[in-house]
Amino acid sequence: MRPVDFTPSSESPTAEKGMKVVYFGNELPQDGIQGICRRLHTYTKDRRYPLLARFIEESTWAVHDEVRQLHAAQKALVSPFESVLHLAEQPELCRGPLCGSIEGVLLCVIQLGTFIGYYEDSPNEYTFDSANTYLTGLGLGLLASTAVSLSPTLADLPLAGAEVVRVAFRLGVLVADVSQNLQPADATGERDSWAYVIPNVAPKEAEEELAVIHTRENTPEASRIFISAISRTSVTISGPPARLRRLFRMSDFFRDRTFVALPVYGGLCHAKHIYNSQHARSVVQGPSIAALDTRFIARYPILSTGSGEPFPTATTATELFEHVMTEILTQAIEWENVIQGVVERAKLLSVSEVQVQVFRNSHPVHDLLSALETSLREGVEVAIKDLGPWITRTRDEERPPPRGTAQSKIAIVGMSCRMPSGATDTEKFWDILEQGLDVHRKIPPDRFDVDSHYDPAGKRVNASHTPYGCFIDEPGLFDAPFFNMSPREAQQTDPMQRLAIVTAYEALERAGYVANRTRSSNKHRMGTFYGQASDDYREVNSAQEISTYFIPGGCRAFGPGRINYFFKLWGPSFSIDTACSSSLATIQAACTALWNGDTDTVVAGGMNVLTNSDAFAGLSHGHFLTKTPNACKTWDCEADGYCRADGVASIVMKRLEDAEADNDNILGVILGAATNHSAEAISITHPHAGAQSCLSRQVLRSAGIDPMDVSYVEMHGTGTQAGDAEEIKSVSDVFAPAVKRRSSQQPVFIGAVKANVGHGEAVAGVTALVKVLLMFQKEAIPPHVGIKNSINPGFPKDLDQRNLRIPYEKKPWPRRPGRKRIAMVNNFSAAGGNSTLAIEEGPLRPKPAGAIDPRSSHLVTVSAKSKISLKGNLERLLSFLDAHPDVALSDLAYTTTARRHHHNHRVAVATSDIADLKAQLCKTLESDSVNTLQPISATGPPPIAFAFTGQGSSYKSWDLQLFQHSPYFRSQILHLDTLAQGQGFPSFVPAIDGSYPRDHAHCPVITQLALVCTEIALAKYWVSLGVTPDVVVGHSLGEYAALHIAGVLSASDAIFLVGQRACLLQERCQPSSHQMMAVRASLEQIEQFAGSLPYEIACVNGPREMVLSGTREEMAAVARLLEAEGFKCIVLEVAFAFHSAQMDPILDEFEALAASGVVFQAPNLPVISPLLSKVVFDEHTIDSVYMRRATRETVHFLSAMKMAHKISTIDDATVWVEIGPHPVCVNFVRSSLPSTSVTVPSFRRGEDNWVTLTSSLGILHCAGVPVDWNEFHQPFERALRLLDLPTYSWNEKTYWIQYQGNWALTKGNTFYDDEAPQTKALAGLASELRTSTVQQIIHEQYDGAAGSVVMQSDLMQPDFLAAAYGHKMNGRGVVTSSIHADIAFTLGEYLYKKLNPNQEPHMNIANLEVVKALVAQENTKSPQLIQVSASTDNIRSRQAHLKWHNVINGSIEEPFASATVYYEEASDWLASWRPATHLVQGRIHALEQLAEDGVANRFTRRMAYGLFASSLVDYADKYRGMQSVVLHELEAFADVVLTTEKGGTWTVPPYFIDSVAHLAGFIMNVSDANDTNANFCVTPGWSSMRFAAPLLPGSKYRSYVKMIPTVEDNNIYLGDVYILQDETIVGMVGGIKFRRYPRILLNRFFSAPDADARKSTPATSAPAPAPPAGSEALQPKAAPASTPAAPASADAPTTNGVKAAAEPDANSTAAKAIALVATEAGLGLSDLKDSASFSSLGIDSLMSLVISEKFRETLGVTVTGSLFLEYPTVGDLKSWLLEYYS
């Protein structure tokens, strides 16, 4: 073969041009090959580098194919790899027998990958041609150059390059096999070099010395050492490593030389005595190279590294590869020949520039450049282009979209959670983390009785060995109506599934999700993925009462399925169980769905609510759980297992590019996620550090992350000795290795959330993820609190040296420019699965420079599904604004409109500043308008009518902000203007764009075209916002725009008619000779007072809205007459008098133009015709004749409206939108159809367009019109940001089925049989009776006609507690007398039926007396028991007696309430009440009259209960039965409707009793007849309570009562509450008593029993809630031990034989106390002599309480209410005060 002659002639077009030399080296970069491969991997995900990605994919496939063909021993050396780039992550492979193959592959991949990527970035620089381009390289670099030589374009390079990579791998295998036969690999794994470089030695001398040695030692030919490379300053010798070492020991010539081992460990090349052309062919030939032959030939010459000449012409790719491979295997490298060849060709080409392209500088490159610079003529520029830095350059901040979904990063855009210990949102969860709290506690009673189900000894069957866990407070709380669930369905639905849908909603809300707003939020492309590993509630709670919803409410699949169904998501819903790693494995599955393109947005998370004691027992016996009181002692030396935990969390994920396009807040970005299994562990539950390490490396590889860039690892950290030790081994090995340690500036922190909130099992992974997201947000690492003693001894001892840190206190974790925070999250399964994900901080998204929202007014909306929630949402928004005073109003408007789902109860505020917004929101709340707002119709959006304004209200010139700011509106205007100019009319844009002042008049053509075209554009703008008309009407000139919107006229034809008509007017009519005049009078009135004068009726707009036309003189005359009669007349600013005789000259020609030049279509909307006073539906009515008549004849707007209403084209619900410059037509609509409810303008004269539009949009929104808010904000979205506003305010109630008894312990065994009697005594008798207030019968006994029954109930049980909190006083739930009544009705009926079976009693609950309030304690986690007994000596006496007791620490306290039940006949009651009926009715009528006269006060429901709450009692909604109240002094009646809302099990629901009876309390605490600021009144009971018929839900009643002070005590009031239905007395609460107390005592009487009332702030005149009940016997609590206690009564000082007390200093506490006593008792100081007894001074028990409270409040002296009994005289008190407070 002849050499290829690439030398151009002197005439060649390449002469005097530049020359390019591309050099591929033979050494891998020594400074971070892994980092380079990671960067290349990252570039392959970038859409800008498809060729690079294809090259890597093709190369990976090629190497996979070659590995498959290896023999078994070699194949076993290669671990699985996903990408050829990942081979760099296997250092053991690079040191093994195949090191030559791996290094060759990586070298070619890096160099060719860099070459391709560089030129994809700069495609214009890819200018190579065969005449002036030369390729060369050393060793394998020469092989890489063949790919470039064969590729005519850059697009061809990936396929040719992949073949180079394949051949490089084969070459390494061949060399390894051949070299192994020359010297086997060292058994110890030590690597020896096969080549040494020796500087300053002549090649000939070296060769002669080697020949001598070989001859002397009879070295076999194949084992001889040889010269493999020659350079100007050195030679390289190669051979078997052992012989090389021997050479340097034995040869004097070589021993005395400097020699350097080269990193050549794979074997020999450049050895012609070993290899031949057959070896070269064996490496090259194969099916893949043959495929290249069909399309590739050598394009650019490659210079031989032996001769320096181009390789011979190759007609196929195979031939070129064989040339190169033969050279690599058999020829020594002589770089000087290459240099000489390049220099000679540069001279022959007479180039002006030589560019040398390299991949980093090197000695050969340096020598080449030096030779070029010294050898070429002066003026020839020699340049080097280093392509290597392209890989490591700083990338653009603006991230390009990924190559495909598989290369996307995953953005987390929303999150929500319910965590233990009151963490009902992420902020409260962060508080727990930040404060370093451990929130474990004893298993609460709403799960199961921990005392009976816990056995620390582990001997009791099915019992737990631990009593501890971490629990969500009140997991049964749920807003069932919001999620369209009935109370029964809610109660039977697993609470974790309920909380999952709640947190899903909140996460989506925080993510700004609105269905179908963008491509990624399309409901068809969204799915749900949740982890769940238990079914406690189904197995235990709802299994006790299996019914309709047992399966859909309890089975796992329904959790995510219900979320999909509620949100109408069409994508997949997965419930995944991988035990403890369920939620993170689920999130990985969700990421995979996003990467695969299966979905565009997912809601994912995990859930766990613990109610089944079996799981505690099973995990205890499996040695999983700690027995000690802690969350998890993660990394502690005494870690003994984990603490179980509740938790529910949801996150919203989408691909990063979608999140950025959607303008989302990005909380964090998932870079990679994977799951594997600890298959090699010693048991299925035992962790395996190797598997964990492998998983971490896999995630890092796929994400292209350097482990040293990870600064935080959230570890699984369950707190077991084995688990903690294995995990720290894997984490330290990967992220803080002992070798290649982290720099001191680059620590990695570790943490574990389980130390705070326990192990949530199925929710553990997402809990950890939420923690990391919060850390990103808060820029802090919270303290780790798991190490209670000392660190686990199994941890590496060199953590500090490795720079691996445990944060024992909160650490800053700030953003840093140019370096993202990256964290890893581990979540492992007891079943052996491991899941890990890598996550980095979300990108900062500042508003772009210059991006502004120019709108002057904004609309803020708030909505809810209930009025209670609406109020809560308003309050939350106000709180947010208070906390964020600098919030941008535009962002707030955008968030609340375009990024929120809108419910049926709506509030909208149009405003220009935050202060005004807050004022309007406060006004809405304070005025109670929330309760009067009407929700939007459930039947769908209202019909919409567009009314197009005529010319009478138009400006002369406009300055439309909408034209300036709205691209859509502007484009419509400009398009219409183009149409107008195309028809020869002048541009009308100057008339609307602010070019002229408003009083500048334009010619009629411009004026009329401007009006009609603006209205057309405005109507289309409304339609673009989703406000689409169902019917149109146009007034006069406005009818042309209306006909276009209805489809009758094209825009071009409408412009033609308007423009031509205006031209005719200018030509045929005299401007201003005639006038149009609006008159505020009816037709009859005008006829009556001006009928004698000439005028024409131009418009009949309403009953009293007329427009007259005529000459100027005629109009002036008419105006004088009408104004004289008091009618308002306004001359319209129009040039012509339309609809009058002035139009006659143009009519014929105008009709002809319309007939010949215009196409009239059938309307696609009903058109209300003011000309015809009818609605047009057909295609024949509107034609050229119609247009003529409409110009000349009267506009009958009034009759047109009435006709349209009559035939139901419009109705009262129709929403009217005025399309025009000022609201005119909508006023006509209102006057014509007064029942019309909603009318809005588009523009208003003198008002900024945005002010008008936002106000109108708010009205439409509240009317139920579905506005496209996204479209409204879209032009300004670059300047807008989504705010993280408070989430929805739920109207929650408790839905919970309580696990009863101990059957989980006893099932299937006899272990507890012997304990049965004892258990029965403790747990109560089996009984069919169980209500919300009578929960457990603990004793019952019957003997003939005598009987007794005793029950115990826990006030902390959800329904009972809710009932108490339904009646709040002083901020606390109080057991109201109505609850006591329900208990009495229940036990009374039960006892009666036991003694008189099959009989139905009518009961009178009589003589109820409550001597001490029963107040709900603050600690809801421990029981608060009461015991009530009912007994009768003889049921035939028809009475039973009841007593109430508190049960404290198992002991029964003195009774605090009592009552008697009389069994009577309802007929007797009705008969006794009948005579009083007319008296009661008479008083009611009298009160009604007083109210009408303004003497009595009438209150709405909201007002009444608002006053009640501000005075004393805050009732829950169910208790608020009074719909209205009429009150005069101490007498009132109320109309009552009982709620239909269900909840709880009752005999007579307390909220029914209270609703019909608490009118008496309302009088006593609201009436201005009492001093309610200073006092409050509570009831200790009544004489009788009787209901002749059951109180029924939804029924209407009327209550009446008059309260009268008693003669004996003016602080006690009595009254009879009559309950009427249909004017018949059906019930009565007789002798109801109220006692008045000073308000200062409210806090003392109504504080939680487990709180020190005297340390809390005294109640003001507007107390918070608490239970009523006290009488004069109410007792204060004893003083705490820390206060100065009074001596025992036996030692109390007395006045007998005791000296007078020393006189205190005037400023002393004692003196102030005595002065206070005098003030409060109304005494003089002189009355308070030391010998005076307090009883003689009139200080009774009530006054004692008041003074005691004043002591505490004013002086800080804490005493009991019995102070004046213990110190009965003034002297006694002085002495005690001086002793303790002087």
From Swiss-Prot:
<feature type="domain" description="Carrier">
    <location>
        <begin position="1704"/>
        <end position="1781"/>
    </location>
</feature>
<feature type="region of interest" description="C-terminal hotdog fold">
    <location>
        <begin position="1495"/>
        <end position="1643"/>
    </location>
</feature>
<dbReference type="GO" id="GO:0006633">
    <property type="term" value="P:fatty acid biosynthetic process"/>
</dbReference>
<dbReference type="InterPro" id="IPR009081">
    <property type="entry name" value="PP-bd_ACP"/>
</dbReference>
<dbReference type="InterPro" id="IPR001227">
    <property type="entry name" value="Ac_transferase_dom_sf"/>
</dbReference>
<dbReference type="Pfam" id="PF00109">
    <property type="entry name" value="ketoacyl-synt"/>
</dbReference>
<feature type="region of interest" description="Malonyl-CoA:ACP transacylase (MAT) domain">
    <location>
        <begin position="946"/>
        <end position="1266"/>
    </location>
</feature>
<dbReference type="InterPro" id="IPR036736">
    <property type="entry name" value="ACP-like_sf"/>
</dbReference>
<dbReference type="InterPro" id="IPR049900">
    <property type="entry name" value="PKS_mFAS_DH"/>
</dbReference>
<feature type="modified residue" description="O-(pantetheine 4'-phosphoryl)serine">
    <location>
        <position position="1741"/>
    </location>
</feature>
<feature type="region of interest" description="Product template (PT) domain">
    <location>
        <begin position="1331"/>
        <end position="1648"/>
    </location>
</feature>
<comment type="pathway">
    <text>Secondary metabolite biosynthesis.</text>
</comment>
<dbReference type="InterPro" id="IPR014043">
    <property type="entry name" value="Acyl_transferase_dom"/>
</dbReference>
<keyword id="KW-0511">Multifunctional enzyme</keyword>
<dbReference type="InterPro" id="IPR020806">
    <property type="entry name" value="PKS_PP-bd"/>
</dbReference>
<dbReference type="GO" id="GO:0044550">
    <property type="term" value="P:secondary metabolite biosynthetic process"/>
</dbReference>
<keyword id="KW-0597">Phosphoprotein</keyword>
<comment type="function">
    <text>Non-reducing polyketide synthase; part of the gene cluster that mediates the biosynthesis of trypacidin, a mycotoxin with antiprotozoal activity and that plays a role in the infection process. The pathway begins with the synthesis of atrochrysone thioester by the polyketide synthase (PKS) tpcC. The atrochrysone carboxyl ACP thioesterase tpcB then breaks the thioester bond and releases the atrochrysone carboxylic acid from tpcC. The decarboxylase tpcK converts atrochrysone carboxylic acid to atrochrysone which is further reduced into emodin anthrone.</text>
</comment>
<dbReference type="GO" id="GO:0004312">
    <property type="term" value="F:fatty acid synthase activity"/>
</dbReference>
<dbReference type="GO" id="GO:0004315">
    <property type="term" value="F:3-oxoacyl-[acyl-carrier-protein] synthase activity"/>
</dbReference>
<dbReference type="InterPro" id="IPR030918">
    <property type="entry name" value="PT_fungal_PKS"/>
</dbReference>
<feature type="active site" description="For beta-ketoacyl synthase activity">
    <location>
        <position position="716"/>
    </location>
</feature>
<keyword id="KW-0596">Phosphopantetheine</keyword>
<dbReference type="GO" id="GO:0031177">
    <property type="term" value="F:phosphopantetheine binding"/>
</dbReference>
<dbReference type="InterPro" id="IPR016035">
    <property type="entry name" value="Acyl_Trfase/lysoPLipase"/>
</dbReference>
<dbReference type="InterPro" id="IPR032088">
    <property type="entry name" value="SAT"/>
</dbReference>
<dbReference type="InterPro" id="IPR018201">
    <property type="entry name" value="Ketoacyl_synth_AS"/>
</dbReference>
<keyword id="KW-0808">Transferase</keyword>
<feature type="active site" description="Proton acceptor; for dehydratase activity">
    <location>
        <position position="1367"/>
    </location>
</feature>
<feature type="active site" description="For beta-ketoacyl synthase activity">
    <location>
        <position position="759"/>
    </location>
</feature>
<dbReference type="GO" id="GO:0019748">
    <property type="term" value="P:secondary metabolic process"/>
</dbReference>
<dbReference type="InterPro" id="IPR016039">
    <property type="entry name" value="Thiolase-like"/>
</dbReference>
<feature type="domain" description="Ketosynthase family 3 (KS3)">
    <location>
        <begin position="407"/>
        <end position="841"/>
    </location>
</feature>
<dbReference type="InterPro" id="IPR042104">
    <property type="entry name" value="PKS_dehydratase_sf"/>
</dbReference>
<dbReference type="InterPro" id="IPR016036">
    <property type="entry name" value="Malonyl_transacylase_ACP-bd"/>
</dbReference>
<dbReference type="InterPro" id="IPR014031">
    <property type="entry name" value="Ketoacyl_synth_C"/>
</dbReference>
<feature type="region of interest" description="N-terminal hotdog fold">
    <location>
        <begin position="1335"/>
        <end position="1468"/>
    </location>
</feature>
<feature type="active site" description="For beta-ketoacyl synthase activity">
    <location>
        <position position="580"/>
    </location>
</feature>
<dbReference type="Pfam" id="PF16073">
    <property type="entry name" value="SAT"/>
</dbReference>
<dbReference type="Pfam" id="PF00550">
    <property type="entry name" value="PP-binding"/>
</dbReference>
<dbReference type="InterPro" id="IPR020841">
    <property type="entry name" value="PKS_Beta-ketoAc_synthase_dom"/>
</dbReference>
<feature type="region of interest" description="N-terminal acylcarrier protein transacylase domain (SAT)">
    <location>
        <begin position="41"/>
        <end position="270"/>
    </location>
</feature>
